């Protein structure tokens, strides 16, 4: 009887150990599946973030190139406007010079006319 109880007890312990081992393996399998699912889920987010970062880097490079082109074009426009402004100033200088010459010529013409009329009046007829 004692040996039978001992055998039953050992059999129950073996069953419990096997059941516990089975549950441990199932728990490990479930934990592994959960871990893989979480990693996959996180990897999707990381992959999306990586793709977004690559797109942003490309856009930044494009923007830098366009900004450099815009700066160059703006510099050219500024140069053209400065040249145009200088040309307008020169035209204004020429116009002022022409007015000055015209005024001097009128003064000379008036003086010559005055002298000529004075000579005509003083000449004996």
Swiss-Prot record:
PANTHER family: BIOGENESIS OF LYSOSOME-RELATED ORGANELLES COMPLEX 1 SUBUNIT 1 (PTHR13073:SF0), BLOC-1 COMPLEX SUBUNIT 1 (PTHR13073)
Subunit record text: Component of the biogenesis of lysosome-related organelles complex 1 (BLOC-1) composed of BLOC1S1, BLOC1S2, BLOC1S3, BLOC1S4, BLOC1S5, BLOC1S6, DTNBP1/BLOC1S7 and SNAPIN/BLOC1S8. Octamer composed of one copy each BLOC1S1, BLOC1S2, BLOC1S3, BLOC1S4, BLOC1S5, BLOC1S6, DTNBP1/BLOC1S7 and SNAPIN/BLOC1S8. The BLOC-1 complex associates with the AP-3 protein complex and membrane protein cargos. Component of the BLOC-one-related complex (BORC) which is composed of BLOC1S1, BLOC1S2, BORCS5, BORCS6, BORCS7, BORCS8, KXD1 and SNAPIN.
Official protein name in the record: Biogenesis of lysosome-related organelles complex 1 subunit 1
A Gene Ontology molecular function term of the record: protein-lysine-acetyltransferase activity
Coiled coil: 1-31
Subcellular location, principal: mitochondrion
Known catalytic reactions: L-lysyl-[protein] + acetyl-CoA = N(6)-acetyl-L-lysyl-[protein] + CoA + H(+)
GO biological process: aerobic respiration; anterograde axonal transport; anterograde synaptic vesicle transport; endosomal transport; lysosome localization; neuron projection development; peptidyl-lysine acetylation
Record's keyword annotation contains Glycosyltransferase: no
GO cellular component terms given for this protein: axon cytoplasm; BLOC-1 complex; BORC complex; cytosol; early endosome; lysosomal membrane; mitochondrial intermembrane space; mitochondrial matrix
Protein purpose: Component of the BLOC-1 complex, a complex that is required for normal biogenesis of lysosome-related organelles (LRO), such as platelet dense granules and melanosomes. In concert with the AP-3 complex, the BLOC-1 complex is required to target membrane protein cargos into vesicles assembled at cell bodies for delivery into neurites and nerve terminals. The BLOC-1 complex, in association with SNARE proteins, is also proposed to be involved in neurite extension. As part of the BORC complex may play a role in lysosomes movement and localization at the cell periphery.
Annotated EC: 2.3.1.-
Family: Belongs to the BLOC1S1 family.
InterPro entries assigned: BLOC1S1
Keywords: Coiled coil, Cytoplasm, Lysosome, Membrane, Mitochondrion, Transferase
Compartments reported by the entry: Mitochondrion intermembrane space; Mitochondrion matrix; Cytoplasm, Cytosol; Lysosome membrane
One family name in Pfam for this protein: GCN5L1
